């Protein structure tokens, strides 16, 4: 049987801090079903320095765990930052890129789909694309 963790024991552990981030500014589009998120996403995606639409369900799960007091705020914050940085890096390297033509998160729904085609042929980790 699992040992229940005393809240005071957890507070004695060092804080988790992530000082440097690859993603300096992020845009999160959230809301109830039918409120216009799908309409807003391509508009935001056409802006300068905005990458592909990404459904980051993991961020929702981390936030739910935090809200239910299952993880501490510093851990939740650091996990979200690491996840966002990982997703951005993978996109910049041409990995985990959606080329299904009709999907909302497809490169073909982006205002500049050719940059994603170029990325899959670049040298990889040695070159960070613009």
Give the ranges of each region predicted by the language model.
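PAPS-dependent sulfation machinery
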Residues: 56-130
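Pre-Walker A (Motif I) flank of P-loop NTPase domains
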Residues: 23-26
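Detector for methionine-enriched segments
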Residues: 1, 39, 47, 79-82, ...
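Long, basic/Gly/Ser/Thr-rich N-terminal segments
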Residues: 1-8
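Pre-Walker A adenine-sensing motif
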Residues: 9-20
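A conserved segment at the C-terminal end of the G1
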Residues: 35-51
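Hydrophobic anchor at the beta1->P-loop junction of P-loop NTPases
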Residues: 29
């Amino acid at each position: 049987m699992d040992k229940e963790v005393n809240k005071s024991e957890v507070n004695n552990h060092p804080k988790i801090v992530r000082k440097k981030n690859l993603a300096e500014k992020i845009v999160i589009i959230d809301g109830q079903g039918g409120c216009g998120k799908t309409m807003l996403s391509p508009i935001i995606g056409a802006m300068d320095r905005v990458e592909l639409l990404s459904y980051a369900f993991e961020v929702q799960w981390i936030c739910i765990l935090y809200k239910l007091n299952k993880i501490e705020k510093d851990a939740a914050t650091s996990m979200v930052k690491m996840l966002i940085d990982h997703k951005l890096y993978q996109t910049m390297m041409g990995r985990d890129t959606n080329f299904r033509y009709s999907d909302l998160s497809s490169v073909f729904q982006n205002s500049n789909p050719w940059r994603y085609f170029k990325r899959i042929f670049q040298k990889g980790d040695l070159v960070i694309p613009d």
